[in-house]
Amino acid sequence: MNGILNINKPPGLTSFGVVSKVRHIYSQKKVGHGGMLDPSATGVIPVFLGSATRLIEYLSSVRKTYLAEIELGTETDSYDSEGEITSRKSCEHITADMVRNALPDFLGEITQIPPMYSAVKHRGVRLYNLARQGIEVERNPRKAAIYGIEFLGFASPVLRLRIECGHGTYIRSIAFDLGRKLGCGAYLKTLVRESYGPFHLTTSLDLADLEAAENKGRLADILLPPEAAVGHLPRITLDDESITRLVNGLEIRLEMTGQPEAMAVYSAENRFAAVIRPETDGSWHPAKVFLSPCPKKNAD
């Protein structure tokens, strides 16, 4: 089967654990996920099956939205509730206005130091593997894009934020850095991913929904089409001749203003055909093809 599942990951399960369960339920080897979540986090994780896995890379540019609960007054070595407590300070003097006034510093393009408990590599070794050995190393700062932070409430010591961000953002690092800015320390208490590009929590499936569909023989019915992953790309409808060239691996030329990094191609019958990318000579090359070439007719 080919398609996408918008899964609501439960707490305590790794992202690869979700993939493993989907692989087992669908009896399919080619399964991958579009964005890792920490085991303690919950929420949206898109899972790709079959040929749809070829589109995972196009999700790297989409925005994500998180609901975060941050507890002030305590720091942990993992920056979240899973780690060992490393510091405690009073936060009784912290007010909601103080939190609001600190938030603008975290908007726009910021730099973050990845937590030691992260998948970032140091000299070929995952940081979390070093952290589990009690080894802490200097980490290079990384850029992150924060598009919005909504203050949802503060009942000391816990504050609630909704954060819209780009690829590679560590919400745990935002919690840690915010605590440092407020002078009391903080850690990420809970995290829910509410959206991942076109995939939203309100339309997600629990793993129990997959099991129910399996029992009813309706696993194919709950799959989203592969093109659901590229809905954010510019869309273009092409004639049969152009699509035939693309599905046969040939470039095409287009009369258009502007040049996006990629476009989703559809046929006149609204069939998803390919993703194309521009070349330096002005042509467009098929990066991913989803229609099969028409068989050649035998000569009379």
From Swiss-Prot:
The keyword Membrane does not apply. One of its GO terms (molecular function) is tRNA pseudouridine(55) synthase activity. Coiled coil: none annotated. One of its GO terms (biological process) is tRNA pseudouridine synthesis. Pfam families: TruB_C_2, TruB_N. Its EC number is 5.4.99.25. The keyword Iron-sulfur does not apply. The active site is at residue 38. PANTHER family: PSEUDOURIDYLATE SYNTHASE TRUB1 (PTHR13767:SF2), TRNA-PSEUDOURIDINE SYNTHASE (PTHR13767). Belongs to the pseudouridine synthase TruB family. Type 1 subfamily. This is tRNA pseudouridine synthase B. It comes from Dehalococcoides mccartyi (strain ATCC BAA-2266 / KCTC 15142 / 195) (Dehalococcoides ethenogenes (strain 195)). The gene is truB.
